[in-house]
A protein has these predicted regions:
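N-terminal secretory signal peptides that target proteins for export/translocation
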Residues: 1-2
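Bacterial N-terminal signal peptides
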Residues: 5-17
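Extracytosolic ligand-binding ectodomains
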Residues: 21-402
């Protein structure tokens, strides 16, 4: 399948209305492209669910802003940066897409960030994790919504080292995201007085982790940290249990775990794992109500990435409604100027580097006996304020920060 054919994977919502005379929107519509992993290792935590989340945000606006219809299209980047870049260029140059959203896979997101920066299009990220996206590769038009490799690793490292797990070994996905996750976790471990005993890197989409896990097992490290995500994490955790790594006294931790991963693993396998997330469906009445809407359309609870797509698209739509135009520079300024307030975040500030400083939550996976209903998987250990969870703007390396 070539890159242009991928745009055939399209879901569209389009409802017409009469526009106020003052509103100025290009092509008399707002067109949002959800660029995701539709069939690969991140499809459960992003994928079609990300498109559903974007549509829920559009529904909240009545599927129109200032009388202009909201159109949402979807494409699969197959976790390949060149395909992601090709789709982004085609969307912007020939299909008049105003916003690109989602883009799990940091290498793909870095490619899209460069294109949206050059073409002056809004880029709403809820899936990639590399801190470079709000660091040296930041953009005036790029916003990183849900988490990053620092926020998911620092809280987990702090919790485990406080329990006495001082020495670490990393099993890392060999691409931009995995490298960033290992790097940020290593910094956190060392800053807290721990040590890194080594690491090994595996190809994206690995099915056999035996050689990598044997090296981790023989390292003697107290913690075997999985610096990967999605299907890679699921496969690694399952095989680590088969090898007896947790049973042998080593602590197994996934530095990026989503509720979908726990669902796939089952509580019997995942119980006791520690993880940092920015969203959990069962936090309060608002999250439960929104998650019920999502589940009605998908048959499952949302991941934090899918919730983040909803939050980001909703925030963008409110921003352009407020200013009466989808002009990218004006929209970007309004996005930054307005704190995020929705079912996911309350009063979250957006930095000059595009980082959304929402709270993170440290969770522990429940034992099977503690779970009372479907998807009842997490126990809240600690709330980590956004200002603490993320790298400070001044230290991010972003040239936009004054």
């Amino acid at each position: 399948m070539n890159a242009f054919a991928l745009t055939a994977i399209v879901g569209t919502i389009c409802i017409s209305a009469v526009a106020p005379a003052r509103a100025q929107f290009s092509d008399d519509r707002i067109k949002i492209g959800v660029l995701s992993d539709i069939a690969g290792i991140y499809s459960d935590i992003n994928g079609e669910g990300a498109a559903v989340a974007a549509r829920l945000a559009a529904e909240d606006m009545g599927n129109a802003v200032a009388g202009k219809p909201i159109e949402i299209i979807v494409a699969d980047h197959q976790n390949k940066p060149d395909i992601a870049a090709s789709i982004a260029r085609k969307w912007i140059d020939t299909e008049q897409v105003d916003v690109i959203a989602d883009v799990p896979n940091s290498a793909a997101a870095l490619a899209v960030q460069a294109i949206t920066k050059e073409r002056k299009r809004i880029f709403l990220m809820s899936g990639p994790g590399s801190v470079e996206l709000t660091g040296k590769s930041c953009s005036p038009f790029g916003f990183m919504w849900t988490w990053d490799t620092h926020s998911v690793s620092a809280g987990t490292a702090q919790a485990l080292i406080a329990k006495g797990d001082q020495s670490w070994f990393f099993v890392t996905a060999d691409y931009a995201f995995g490298h960033s996750l290992e790097d940020e976790a290593s910094k956190a471990v060392k800053a807290l007085g721990g040590t890194v005993k080594g690491g090994v890197r595996h190809p994206l989409g690995s099915s056999d982790f035996s050689s990598f896990l044997l090296r981790a097992q023989s390292s003697g490290a107290k913690v075997v940290a999985l610096a990967n995500a999605g299907g890679d994490t699921i496969n690694a955790v399952k095989q680590a249990n088969e090898f007896g790594i947790p049973q042998g006294g080593q602590t197994l931790t996934g530095l990026l775990l989503n509720i979908n991963d726990i669902h796939a693993l089952t509580l019997q396998v995942a119980q006791g794992l520690t993880l940092s997330n920015s969203f959990y469906w069962d936090m309060n009445d608002e999250t439960r109500a929104w998650s019920a809407r999502f589940e009605a359309k998908t048959g499952r609870k949302p991941s934090m990435n899918q919730a983040g797509v909803y939050s980001a698209v909703r925030h963008y739509l409110h921003a352009v409604k407020q200013i009466g135009t989808d002009d990218p520079e004006k929209a970007a300024a309004q996005i930054r100027a307005t704190p995020v307030n929705d079912m996911m975040m309350k009063g979250a500030r957006i930095g000059q580097n595009g980082r959304v400083f929402g709270d993170m939550y440290l969770f522990e996976v429940k034992k099977p006996s503690e779970s009372k209903r479907p998807w009842d998987y997490f126990k809240l250990v600690r709330t980590i304020p956004g200002a603490e969870a993320y790298i400070a703007e001044k230290d991010s390396g972003c040239g936009l920060v004054k």
